[in-house]
Amino acid sequence: MVANKSKATKRKVAAAPQPPTAQDKPATNGRSTKQPEADSDQSASDYYESDEENLLANINNDDGDSSDSEGEGDASDGEVQGLNIESDSDFEEDDQEADGEEEEEDSADDVNSDSSPEEDEGESEEEEEDDDEGDLEFEEDLAEPEKPRAIKEGSKAGKKQAPEVESEEEDDLETKKLLEAAAKEDEKLAALDSVLGPDGEKKTRGVGSFPPERKTGRLKNSDEYAGGDTSDEEDIRNTVGNIPMHWYDEYKHIGYDWDGNRLIKPPKMDTIDEFLKRMEDPNFWRTVKDPQTGQNVVLSDEDVGLIKRIMAGRNPDQQYNDYEPWIEWFTSEVEKMPIRNIPDHKRSFLPSKSEKQKIGRLVHALKMGWVKTRAETERLAAAAKGPKFYMVWDSDHGKEDIRRIHDHVVAPKRPLPGHAESYNPPPEYLFNERELAEWNSHEEEPWRRKLHYIPQKFNSLREVPYYAQYVRERFLRCLDLYLCPRGKRTRVTVGPEYLIPKLPSPKDLQPFPTLQNLVYRGHTDMIRTISIEPKGEYLVTGSDDKTIKIWEVSTARCIKTIPTGDVVRSVAWCPNVKISLIAVASGKRTLLINPHVGDCLLSKKTDDLLAEAPKHEVVDNERISTAVQWVDVAEEEQKAGVRIVINHFREIKQVTWHGRGDYFATVMPEAQNRSVLIHQLSKRRSQFPFSKSKGLIQCVLFHPVKPCLFVATQRHIRVYDLVKQELLKKLFPSCKWISSMAIHPKGDNLLVATYEKKMMWFDLDLSTRPYQQLKLHFSAIRNVAFHQRYPLFASASDDRSVIVSHGMVYNDLMQNALIVPLRRLENHERVNDFGAFDVVFHPTQPWLFSSGADNTVRLYT
């Protein structure tokens, strides 16, 4: 026992402990300072090396007992293992080089550490705070075994150490104290052996070299691996990353979890607990420390087998067979028959055509002299190296070039003679008396004359006299050539690519409709017209199946179907948000329908407003009464939502509302001078704005801001002032048949569609002619529409396409409108040469609705 203690003492001295720090408080009663729990970095590294040797030794000793293998593996450890003095020769040699003063400090500390419990009790209160600080500075990882303190014995350290200590320090009193402390330690070990029984010597070797650790006020963390869960994915609880973990040696925590809370280091086991665990735990030899969490991880059988195979120099993969049977992939036997016995192709026996062409090109180059033979090449090279001859008395061409006129401009040719200079000109070229008097009056100002001579007529060429002005004209010609400067006119050649205007990219002009989103199906015949509610929640459609349908925009669900009794050619939702009303042009009737969708109070208010007809004080004239009648609604139509019926004497093509929602106009193209009717809803009156017909009227449109009415005939568009009752201007689209038109929300630009595949953009402040013509469609254009908020307009054509374009109108009157085609949407199907009929934009969103001959309405977003 004493020998083992002295060995531990010498190993502690050889570890070269650090001098006490400022945090260590001086001991009372004149004792030396308290040694910290943890040793220096050098001792810690020595301990790690011994621990690895311990693990490898236990792995190699498969047949031995776990406790025995631990005892053998710990022989190189810092703890006292037994009386095997010969195995510690390396440590004895290191102990001979140790310093004497360090041994004195260690022995003194050991004596003080073995003091009575009363003294320890008195010091515990004073040093409790100091121990906590020491834990922060010197505590190591959780799974790392605790390094023992300086061994307190030195009396029987070995055959070589004791004589040296006695010879060096014979008069030192500290040596006596060290011997006394060793004797006390032997007494403690004897008492412990008596308690543990006959096997105590085997199980408690080196217990006395580990003083008990003081208990701190910290709670122990539960072992993460108590349940045997060693999943790699669940072990990553410390979020500090791949950093050196010794940075946390001075702190109570080892990192942070996923919630940002500190991971507190679990307290270290004292020496006795660790020794008991080493002796009793069968898995102690396969337990390693996780540096991230500080917990102990028990290696599985697969991990231990992997380590054994690596140490034995074998393949780490257990399934790999080093002695697999040899498979001869490529045989060494010579085959008698060929594996691939395909006959040669015919082209392998024929001369190559590509080589024939190359030879032909070389022969042609030789004939043309492009390819020189070797003799010709040498002859030309010798001639180039030989002397060069030139004319000695040859003129200097450089000076002559300087005297010449550079960039000579050819003299203009004289104009050829005309019919008036003929000797027998036509009679109309001869002067009459008035023209002759006028020519003679410019005698003093000859430059004002159209001709510088008087045309004359002779019967034959023999009668032509001598021309008296010949010499003078030659002289003037010479003066012109001599004195008049000449100049070149540079003709600017402009390519066609420069004539195309540079338009911005469509990506910079978003948002605009690009894809089909919803399809509204339900009609059984082609849908000619559509209109949307001012709030954008509901859509009304009119079809040739003699019904109108009201749809919910967001879900494409048909809410209501109302029969009209005839083909529906036009529908228009009232723009006034205070009433809920739809105007429908069906055959010769105009129906005002309350759809009863949306706000119930709004629908009730509309019914109350249209319940009673106002009394007319003025009787309508016969011209109006024979053309239009406001009649009562039948009971069946009243239940369907029809509130007012207006009968016309001709078929109605279009119905459109004024911006305020009180006036609406209807168009009857076959009614001649009574084609346009303007109706007032509040007074239930109708009137003809025009007394004469200026052509076959196609459609009308109210100005969004001013009291103006746009009337489109087949070839012209007239703008009338309804207040002054006069014609403001007449627009000339230069087309043969106008189909529809739409006005910009600001009212300064008009878009006209024709059946001739063209669209015309009119700037009303600029000219009566089109500002720009757009030829984007391949068939007749049925309808056009502007967006109320975004700079967008769209057109629908019989080529089943709907084209969305960008139309920006600037507030600056000096800047023209920017028109850029954006997207062609071809989703409708063609039926009987009909494609898309009508288009309308959503009032607030950049969405587009289109109706077609395929009985569908499509929403583009």
UniProtKB/Swiss-Prot annotation:
Gene Ontology BP annotations: maturation of 5.8S rRNA from tricistronic rRNA transcript (SSU-rRNA, 5.8S rRNA, LSU-rRNA); maturation of LSU-rRNA from tricistronic rRNA transcript (SSU-rRNA, 5.8S rRNA, LSU-rRNA)
GO CC aspect terms: nucleoplasm; PeBoW complex; preribosome, large subunit precursor
Tree of life domain: Eukaryota
Disordered: annotated span: 1-237
Bias type Acidic residues, positions: 62-77, 87-143
WD repeats: 522-561, 563-603, 692-730, 733-772, 776-815, 831-861
Keyword set, alphabetical order: Nucleus, Repeat, Ribosome biogenesis, rRNA processing, WD repeat
Biased composition (Polar residues): 29-45
Biased composition annotated in UniProt, kind: Basic and acidic residues: 144-156, 174-190, 212-223
Subcellular location as annotated: Nucleus, Nucleolus; Nucleus, Nucleoplasm
Record-level Gene Ontology MF annotations: ribonucleoprotein complex binding
Function: Required for maturation of ribosomal RNAs and formation of the large ribosomal subunit.
Family of the protein in this entry: Belongs to the WD repeat BOP1/ERB1 family.
Protein name (database record): Ribosome biogenesis protein BOP1 homolog
Taxonomic lineage of the native organism: Eukaryota, Metazoa, Ecdysozoa, Arthropoda, Hexapoda
